[in-house]
Amino acid sequence: MSRAAFAVFARFTPARWRPRQPALLAGTLILLCWVLVALLAPWVAPFDPIAQDPSASLQPPGGVHPFGTDNYGRDIFSRVMWASRIDLQISLLGVVFPFCIGTLLGALSGYLGGLTDTLVMRVIDVVLAFPFLVLMLAIIAVLGPGLLSFYIAMAMVGWVSYARLVRAQVLTLRQRDYILAARSLGYSHWRVLFIHLLPNALTSSLVFSMSDCVLVLLSGAAISYLGLGVQPPLAEWGVMVAEGQSFITTAWWMTTFPGLAIVLLAMGFSLLADGLGERLGARP
C-alpha cells in the first residue's frame, strides 16, 4: 500500500477502530502469546524437551519435527516452548529484585539527602565504574553457575539504574506544595515518602523496567551461552544457541529458532516499554 493510499485509508477509518497506542497493543499481544506458550508447554509440546533419540539426530525442519532436531535427537520445537518458561522467569524476576532495591535506596537517597545521599551515590559510582556484563560474570564466577547466582548478581548490579531514576524524581517532587503540606501537618518521614512521594516518582521506573527486561533477557541468554547460567540438559534459549554453534553450517535450525525466540520476546518487551512511555508520558 502506497503512502497516499495509507493516508486516505487512515483518514476514513473510524477512530474507535484504531488503537491509540499501537506499540502498547503489539507488545502486550506478543507477551501474552509467549505467556500462553509457557503455560501450555507441558500439554502442547509434542516431545519431552530432554528426551534423546540418537536415531533422529540433526533432522531438518518438517514433518514430525517442525523446527528440526539437535545433535542428540531432541525436538527443537518442544525445547523452544519449554525454554520460554525459564526465559520469561529470568526476564521478570531479574527485574523485580533490582527494581525493589533500587527504588527503596533511590527514594531514601533523594528524600533524606545528606550522608545517606552521599553514601548511596558513591556506591552507585563504584558499580558504574565496571562494565555491566563483566561485573555480572565476576559475581557469578564467585558464586558458581546457576539461576540463583544470576539473580543475586542481577540484584547487586542492576539496582543502580532504578536508584538514579527514583532519586532524580524524588529530588524534583520533594519541594512540591503537596509534599510541603504533608510535612507541615506533622506526618512522619515514612508516611510522606511512601504514601505521598514515592507513588508519584515511579512512572519513569515502571517504564524503564520493561526496557530493562530486554537487557535482563539478553544478559541471561549470554551468561547461559557462556556456561554460567542455566545448565544443560535444561532447555534455555541461550544454552540452545551455544549447543548449536558447532553445527551452524550443517544444522542452522539449532541456533536460528532459539535466536528468533529471543528476538521476538525482546521485541515484545521493547514495544511494551514504548507504549507505556507514550501512555504515561514518560520515556524509558
Roles of regions detected by a PLM:
Residues I76-Y111, L265:
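Transmembrane alpha-helix signature in integral membrane proteins
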Residues I140, L147, V157, T203-C213, ...:
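C-terminal transmembrane helix and the adjacent membrane-cytosol boundary/short C-terminal tail
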Residues R85-I101, F130, M136, W190-A222, ...:
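Transmembrane alpha-helices
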Residues M1-L32, S270-P284:
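Transmembrane alpha-helical segments of polytopic membrane transport and secretion proteins
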Residues P66, D70, C100-I101, G110-T172, ...:
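Generic hydrophobic transmembrane alpha-helix motif, especially the helices
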